[in-house]
């Protein structure tokens, strides 16, 4: 097994700069494509997951993340699937936390559905995780079970409680879905803000084949914002978390509300991130199919220099923006791979 403490990293390099002058400082890593939910907008009910033998080992994920950190990544987010269902995931998180202690990494965080949070919240806090995103689209238990296909809302709420008690700041991510949760969004905002949690609303994205007509789910956030403005006083603020959300404050609740709008108002001009899958494929853009096989470079040499060069070559191909569209005529996704593989 590779000694992650003793293995030297590549020598310091210039920051990763893409062809459009944007520094890449944010890495999102999907540690597994598996999930204990089957959210209707994310994956098919009878999803075929990758064979476990195809996944990078935890040691390989650590090595890849460490090379990216050496090359200028300051924020690392673990995603899935559901990251906390990956076996021995806390071993990886514990090892990665050394980069927080050294000052090489500003933030180690994750996006989770919350189902396993009650179990892991204390350990996450001990590893230096200070912020997490919890995906939660409704506070109605029956609708929650419908959208997740078999999720238990009470477990998620218990997980949020545990995270907050452990001192972790929780942000709620909610996908806005037409005729499903649009009428509930004000209630969700009041509930979250009442507990000191920010909320980010997200437009559904055309990724992966699912059983539903995606055009029936799509709800533009411009419309949601207009509806909210009839109930709340919204004020734009320059607050940023390193991601694509644009934020407002709500006077009536005192909380922050973010909007992620890949369809109606893209966030490409300031994109600072790339995405690594659990099989070692690097996607330079969420909404493009171009990728780079870092697993090959990882396994070809014990030296990190070859891997560093493969990363540089990939970053040189980072596009200016994505190609997301809702194909209303053929109901085809813009990107064939599922979000659960790329990392949500």
Swiss-Prot record:
GO BP terms, alphabetized? Mo-molybdopterin cofactor biosynthetic process
Pfam families reported for this sequence: Fer4_12, Mob_synth_C, Radical_SAM
Q: Cite the binding residues for GTP.
A: 28, 77, 111, 171, 273-275
Keywords of this entry:
4Fe-4S, GTP-binding, Iron, Iron-sulfur, Lyase, Metal-binding, Molybdenum cofactor biosynthesis, Nucleotide-binding, S-adenosyl-L-methionine
Binding annotation for [4Fe-4S] cluster 2? 268, 271, 285
The enzyme class is lyase
Cofactor(s) needed, names only, are:
[4Fe-4S] cluster
**Quick one: which pathway?**
Cofactor biosynthesis; molybdopterin biosynthesis
Checking InterPro entries in the record gives: Aldolase_TIM, Elp3/MiaA/NifB-like_rSAM, MoaA, MoaA_NifB_PqqE_Fe-S-bd_CS, MoaA_twitch, MoCo_biosynth_MoaA/MoaC, rSAM
Q: Which residues bind [4Fe-4S] cluster 1?
A: 35, 39, 42
As its record notes, the protein acts as a catalyst of: GTP + AH2 + S-adenosyl-L-methionine = (8S)-3',8-cyclo-7,8-dihydroguanosine 5'-triphosphate + 5'-deoxyadenosine + L-methionine + A + H(+)
Q: Please give the function described in this protein's UniProt entry.
A: Catalyzes the cyclization of GTP to (8S)-3',8-cyclo-7,8-dihydroguanosine 5'-triphosphate.
**NCBIfam families in UniProt:** moaA
Q: Which family does it belong to?
A: Belongs to the radical SAM superfamily. MoaA family.
Q: Which HAMAP family match?
A: MoaA_B
Query: Which protein is depicted?
Result: GTP 3',8-cyclase
